């Protein structure tokens, strides 16, 4: 019987998850089924769709926007990183029938940074722009690599203070940042609107990597802005997407996919 997986979302037609997981299955040498499931934007509809899929033998599921908080509530138990994130992007069915809720977003970021881009995070000064769900989901995995410091900056400073307080790290107002960071990560939604965050341009002086968690076929507005103002290297979040998918796949199947080759495939397709 071919194992079945899905991704729940709304919208979901754009999701690259089926393609990514089929690449992973090719690496493992197995057949899987991976579908997209469009769900209406209510808790009842999400719960019904998730319950139906899992009761019918679904071997695992991914969850994308806007359902990560619904997924957290639906899960029977949670990983430490899901608890830290307050959101779930992966369901892992357990042998006892319970559903483990995990969040692989932060691991996806770290895998892209460390395995794919070759960045050493230990001892680095990291700035995280944004204080929403995207930012919260990556803090714990970043801290696990023992950076010298991790600072959260946000347009609404009180939200940065609130998130920083959860993890006992630093917060800073977005417009009062100083040029003292090795790595700057954009977890705001600015690139969705084709704009860079409202930050002082000189913060990129001395920065060797400016990383946008958003991805696109061409350099994002954040990447362009960072490069123009001194960032030595820029990257988008495609590798994070592949990395979080790989972390989920490994939990489901016990097979660790190679992410670099999949990223190359996706880049080549985007360039066609």
Residues of each region from the PLM?
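Mobile, glycine- and charge-enriched loop segments
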Residues: 24-37, 111-128, 180-182, 201-211, ...
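Adenosine-phosphate binding glycine-rich loop
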Residues: 123, 213-272
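Glycine-rich adenosine-cofactor-binding loop
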Residues: 9, 103-106, 113, 117, ...
